[in-house]
């Protein structure tokens, strides 16, 4: 097998694992939510709790990822996570009992974390070991692709008149198809500390202060992300002037996210990772607010494109940075970052669901998301400013060191 073909198959396995674990097992719930509310009697409060339970599962999965160090165990958990994604997708269509849905959403969250963190770690580790550029733009295109696929599928199945159960079973069939290459083309991990060419792969962790601020910023980004990602279909479906367009808007999120990660990789090369993250955070605030600032389908779609293009880009940049700090065990810091992101995702949907039950709609949640994103973006801007200053000081410090050495 040639190196180019190997890289293609590894990246394809990673992309399809994200389409399965995140797009189908996790995000199909969002475009199906209005249908389940109409046909299965799912209330707005219960919808929020189910979303939170899913994110709790994701949070637990992230905790496990941050603690697991054995590469072989990571590989096994990645594969078990994808199988869990298939089983839990099927379970959603089998029963109408809320407790069954809750268990299913929790395990789906575990599977999503496994595919996201262990799968991403395996891909990044393989790229670094084989002396490829340590960028995950193509890989994280699977998140946007998964969102687009689930939204387009729900739109098509709604036109065919399929009920909520049939749609979950259709997604189960898709999940089975995706599982085969996602498992077969992901290579077993290599636990050595050098690349194939013999170059060392030393871990270079950030300072505790940097990590604390970075975690806080990512927590805020988690709030900004999860409210829109979970409730945007229900929100848009109830807005005057754009009612019934929620699934189309969700499709736009996926369309915006699929190619965006590659673009953000290019922006990061010019601005640095932190500069790209700061810009993405600012644009995401605009994307969150556009659907509710004016009852216009054009603005709602533009907001969705911005939201999808920035949220997936931010996740890609953050997890790529985390993996570079720990190239031999990329999932270690990825798990810590995702714990922060996941904690926000576990809290915010339940609060949004409660607010929706109180106020009668979900729009208050979007304003909360925008405020949280503003705080997170400010923290990222602060880290970027410190990074710029340190980059400017580095040559001067090196020159001083050389001058001192020369004078001895």
Kindly label every feature range from the protein language model.
Residues 30, 210-251, 255-259:
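Extracytoplasmic gate region of multi-pass secondary transporters
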Residues 41, 73, 94-100, 294-295, ...:
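Helix-breaking motifs and short loop linkers at transmembrane-helix boundaries and internal kinks
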Residues 60-97:
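Conserved MFS/SLC helix-loop-helix module at the cytosolic interface between two early adjacent transmembrane helices
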Residues 61-73, 260-272, 356-357:
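Helix-to-loop junctions at the C-terminal end of transmembrane segments
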Residues 98, 129-187:
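Helix-loop-helix hairpin linking two adjacent transmembrane segments in secondary transporters
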Residues 104-142:
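Cytoplasmic helix-loop-helix junction between adjacent transmembrane helices
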Residues 272-321:
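C-terminal transmembrane helical hairpin of 12-TM major facilitator-type secondary transporters
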Residues 328-361, 369:
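A late C-terminal transmembrane helix in Major Facilitator Superfamily
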């Amino acid at each position: 097998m040639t190196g180019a073909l190997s890289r293609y198959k590894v990246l394809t396995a990673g992309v399809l694992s994200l389409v399965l674990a995140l797009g189908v097992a996790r995000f199909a719930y969002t475009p199906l939510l209005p249908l389940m509310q109409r046909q299965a009697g799912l209330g707005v409060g219960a919808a929020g709790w189910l979303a939170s339970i899913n994110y709790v599962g994701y949070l637990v999965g992230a905790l496990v990822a941050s603690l697991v160090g054995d590469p072989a165990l990571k590989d096994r958990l990645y594969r078990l996570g994808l199988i869990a994604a298939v089983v839990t997708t099927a379970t959603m269509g089998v029963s109408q009992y809320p407790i069954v849905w809750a268990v299913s959403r929790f395990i789906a969250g575990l599977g999503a974390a496994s595919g996201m963190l262990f799968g991403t770690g395996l891909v990044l580790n393989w790229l670094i070991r084989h002396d490829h550029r340590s960028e995950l733009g193509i890989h994280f295109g699977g998140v946007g692709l998964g969102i687009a696929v689930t939204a387009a599928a729900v739109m098509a199945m709604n036109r065919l008149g399929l009920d909520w159960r049939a749609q979950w079973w259709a997604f189960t069939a898709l999940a089975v198809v995706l599982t085969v290459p996602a498992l077969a083309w992901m290579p077993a991990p290599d636990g050595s500390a050098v690349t194939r060419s013999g170059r060392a792969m030393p871990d270079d962790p950030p300072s505790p202060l940097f990590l604390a601020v970075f975690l806080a910023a990512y927590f805020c980004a988690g709030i900004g992300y999860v409210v829109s990602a979970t409730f945007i279909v229900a929100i848009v479906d109830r807005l005057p002037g754009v009612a019934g367009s929620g699934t189309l808007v969700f499709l736009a999120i996926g369309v915006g996210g699929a190619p965006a990660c590659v673009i953000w990789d290019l922006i990061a090369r010019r601005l640095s990772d932190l500069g790209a993250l700061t810009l993405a955070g600012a644009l995401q605030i605009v994307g969150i607010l556009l659907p509710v600032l004016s009852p216009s389908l054009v603005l709602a779609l533009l907001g969705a494109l911005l939201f999808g293009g920035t949220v997936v880009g931010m996740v890609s940049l953050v997890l790529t940075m985390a993996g570079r700090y720990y190239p031999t065990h990329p999932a270690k810091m990825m798990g810590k970052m995702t714990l922060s992101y996941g904690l926000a995702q576990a809290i915010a949907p339940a609060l949004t669901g409660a607010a929706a039950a109180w106020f009668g709609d979900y729009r208050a949640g979007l304003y909360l998301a925008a405020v949280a994103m503003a705080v997170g973006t400010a923290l990222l801007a602060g880290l970027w400013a410190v990074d710029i200053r340190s980059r400017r000081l580095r040559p001067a410090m090196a020159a001083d060191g050389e001058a001192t050495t020369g004078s001895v």
